[in-house]
Every structure is written in C-alpha cells, then in structure tokens.
C-alpha cells in the first residue's frame, strides 16, 4: 500500500495534475511543474504518514494505559481479597478464643478484636456486636461459695469489665468534645486515626453489667431491656440518637443520667431503680416510665420533655423531684404512687394528669424531716385522704379539666 502511494506521488500524480493545460509550456516548464507537484504530493504523504504514526502511537499508548489500569484493578482486587481473608482469619481466631477456658486468652481475644475494628472500619459494628454478645452471656453477679469458684468468678469479672471498658473507650466522646458536639461527631467520616467510633448501635438485652461507666456515650441507638446493672451506673452526658430501650432493666445502686440526651423514643417501662438522677436530661421524642419503680429518690429537676412523658403506675417510694422540669407536650402520672417528698416547682404551667394517683401517707406531717418532708404539687391538684384508710390519699383536681382537653392515649414505643 505504501509503495502504491509513493508511485502515485512520484509518477502518476505529477502526470495527471500537469497534463492540462499543456499549451504554451516549454519542456523545462513542464518538468518544473511536475517536480513541484511531485514535491507537494510527497510532502502530503509524509504528513499523512506522520499523522498516521501519531494515531498509531496514541492508540498504542491508550491501550497500554488500559492494560496497566486493568492490571492495577486486578492487583487491587487480589490485595483486597488477601486482606479480607486475613481479617476474617483474625476475626475467627479471636472469636474462637473468646470461648477459651483461660481468662488471659479471652482477654487477648478482646484486645485483638478491638485492634481489628480500629484498623478496619467496616468491621466495627460487627466487633461491637460480638462484645455485646459476650456481655449477654449468662453471668452470676453473686459471689461463688468455694475458693476455686471465687477465683474463676473474679477472672470472669475482669474479662467482662475489660469488654465494657473497650466499648466505652470507643463509644464515649473524647474529653475535648462536648455533648453539644455529639451530632457532629456522629456525622464525621470514620477514620483509622480516631479513637471514637461513630455510627454504632448497642444491643445489651439481658446483659449483666458491673460498674457500667459510660459518661459521654454517643450511639445511634441502644437496647438494655432486662439488663442487670450492678454497682453504680453512669450515663452522664450520654446521647442516644435513636431508640433507647431500658424496659425491665434493674439498677441495684445509683443510676445517673444527668444531662443525657434521648433523641428518639425512650422506654423505661417496668425498670427498677434504687436511686436515680435525670437532672437536666432531655427527652425529645417521648419517654415511657410505665410501672417503673424508684425504691429511693429520683431527681428529674430541669429535665425537658419534647413528646409524651408517661409515668403511669410508677411507684415513687422515696422523693420525686421535678423542679423546673419542662413538659412541651402532655404528661401523665395516672395511678402513680408517691410515698415520699414531691416537688413540681416550675415557672411554666404544667399540663399533667394525676387521675388515680395515690399518696402515702396523705399528710406531710407523717414524713421524715428535711427535704423529704416537703410536698409541692402542681397548681390545681391536692391530696384527698381516703375515708376508709387515713394512711392513704388520692390526688384530685381542684378545678376539673374540660374532658375535651384530656390528654389522648399515648402511643407506645416501637420496641416491645
């Protein structure tokens, strides 16, 4: 093909392009004209050859680029597969070690899982689920009888406390991050360099938890239904961005939820407290305390309620302090029982129902001295002693509310 083009440029082309017109041209002029045409055609062919070479070179370059990209993709894929296999092997080995009879082996497994999750962002929720599952395993809070059993019990306790500390270390906000910045901390892109793990949920249903200190906890959601909290429980400044469930949970010592924020539905139905604090706690989407029991005092001063606040059939065996609490929506204390001091001091009206609420004893003079001897009910409510039992009384409204204004039935949380 190249020879034909060259022959055309050197012989045929000049002859075709110079044969007309030929009148009046000398032989020398014809020869010069053919040479000029020949030179032009050769230059054109050279240009085409250069252009073709460039096209071929570029095509070859692009093909090489595609081949290199394909090789890199395949190498990356192979590398990821190797990494995944390695991570899975480490994960399976650590999980297997959690069932080991020796406590030091179980402790090593916990730390291995935490390190694995720190370096592999996609494994964090899975590792948290494993730690929660370990804490949900049966565990007796009572001391064992024999020395050998006591030693085993003590070792098991240390393993469980380590699991709790690892969770707290990665799910509680750093000290330099305030509770007000919890939302930004949750929205931040997870990083291998950050100790805090955003986007995590907890499931500790039925778990036995000891000295559960999770001040500054920040999670999407958490379920502690039927959990048993031994010793002190600290949730100061905690933030629950989704559902928070404590249904049927029991706290055998002080439980502190001061300045905690509950952004979603919150369920404390049937929970049992010894002494509890919810000072300045915020419940944004409804809280249910139905049939909860407070064996000693509960302090809910300055707490805020953005949705329904349901305290139906709650038993307050000690003091119940709601000073300066703010209820944006309706609140109900229907059929609740108050046995100690009570205070509902507030600078804003309280829209609450106390129908059927019981007061034991009905008169403040039977209470012990001090703050527990004070009872300050919301305006419009007073205690009416029972005719049959002078040690009992019922809260009644001085000015009955219009039936059309009675709080509608409260919807329950979505978790049963």
Language-model features: locations:
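Alpha-helical architecture
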Residues: 41-44, 58, 100
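N-terminal leader/targeting and pre-domain segments
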Residues: 68-71, 77-80, 85, 89-107, ...
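Transmembrane signal-anchor/signal-peptide helices with a preference for the extracytoplasmic
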Residues: 24, 49-82
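Short hydrophobic membrane-inserting helices
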Residues: 1-52, 70, 286
């Amino acid at each position: 093909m190249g020879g034909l083009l060259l022959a055309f440029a050197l012989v045929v082309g000049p002859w075709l392009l110079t044969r007309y017109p030929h009148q009046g041209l000398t032989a020398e002029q014809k020869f010069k004209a053919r040479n000029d045409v020949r030179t032009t055609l050769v230059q054109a062919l050279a240009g085409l050859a250069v252009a073709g070479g460039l096209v071929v070179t570029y095509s070859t370059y692009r093909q090489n680029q595609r081949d290199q990209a394909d090789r890199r993709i395949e190498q990356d894929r192979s590398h990821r597969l190797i990494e995944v296999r390695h991570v899975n092997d480490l994960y399976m080995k650590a999980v297997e070690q959690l069932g080991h009879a020796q406590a030091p082996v179980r402790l090593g497994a916990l730390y291995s899982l935490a390190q694995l999750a720190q370096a592999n962002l996609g494994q964090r929720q899975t590792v948290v689920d494993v730690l929660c599952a370990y804490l949900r395993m049966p565990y007796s809070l009572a001391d064992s009888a024999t020395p050998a059993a006591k030693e085993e019990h003590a070792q098991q306790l240390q393993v469980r406390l380590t699991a709790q500390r690892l969770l707290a270390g990665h799910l509680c906000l750093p000290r330099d991050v305030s509770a007000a910045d919890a939302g930004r901390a949750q929205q931040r892109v997870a990083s291998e360099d950050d100790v805090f793990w955003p986007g995590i949920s907890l499931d500790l249903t039925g778990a036995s938890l000891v000295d559960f200190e999770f001040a500054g906890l920040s999670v999407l959601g958490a379920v502690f239904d039927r959990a048993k909290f031994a010793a002190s429980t600290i949730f100061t400044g905690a933030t629950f961005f989704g559902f928070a469930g404590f249904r049927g949970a029991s706290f055998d010592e002080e439980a502190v939820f001061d300045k905690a924020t509950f952004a979603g539905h919150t369920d404390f139905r049937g929970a049992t407290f010894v002494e509890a604090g919810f000072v300045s706690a915020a419940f944004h989407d409804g809280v249910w305390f139905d049939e909860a029991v407070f064996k000693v005092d509960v302090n809910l001063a300055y707490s805020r309620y953005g949705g329904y606040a349901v305290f139906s059939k709650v038993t307050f065996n000690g003091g119940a302090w709601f000073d300066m609490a703010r209820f944006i929506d309706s609140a109900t204390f229907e059929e609740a029982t108050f046995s100690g001091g009570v205070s509902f001091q507030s600078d804003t009206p309280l829209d609450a129902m106390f129908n059927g609420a019981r007061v034991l004893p009905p008169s403040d003079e039977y209470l012990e001295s001090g703050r527990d001897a004070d009872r300050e009910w919301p305006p419009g409510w007073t205690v009416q002693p029972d005719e049959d039992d002078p040690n009992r009384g019922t809260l009644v409204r001085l000015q009955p509310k219009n039936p059309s204004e009675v709080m509608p039935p409260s919807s329950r949380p979505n978790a049963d």
